[in-house]
Amino acid sequence: MIPAEYFEDIRLAVDCLRRGGVILYPTDTVWGIGCDATCSEAVRRVFEIKRRADAKALITLVGSVAALERVVDPDAIPDVAYELIEFSTRPTTIVYDRASRASGIAPELLAPDGSIGVRVTSEAFSRALCEAFRRPLVSTSANVSGEAAPETFAAISREISGA
């Protein structure tokens, strides 16, 4: 269920994501740039906006353990990962050996060895967004690579917000 105060923003974000667009959104760490993690064109656009080398990985954000198990082959998720997700008090990204072949994850999000970094978000807006979109999101800080990550929307540079 989407909280009423987020409904319109989430509706607009999901519409943009479904069209292959890129969004700015609050995450459980900083303000982020996001896109559909299954859309190669959108993922490449995020790299372009950030002026980030393809070799520097982006993480994938999901809203639940069930969504994680659609992105990562459940056999590749060790028990300790479930414990970290359940008990960690801080945002934790875990690198898994391989994505599920059925996940449709854009190949640009996989490391050369096939591994993938995924975080199960606990932040209310990003979790509601993941649940409404029903696909994994790319999550990376809303800054040009090498610059400070914005903790507030107002701190996002015009270069990023206007891209």
What positions do the PLM features span?
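Active-site-adjacent structural elements in enzyme catalytic cores
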Residues: 1-163
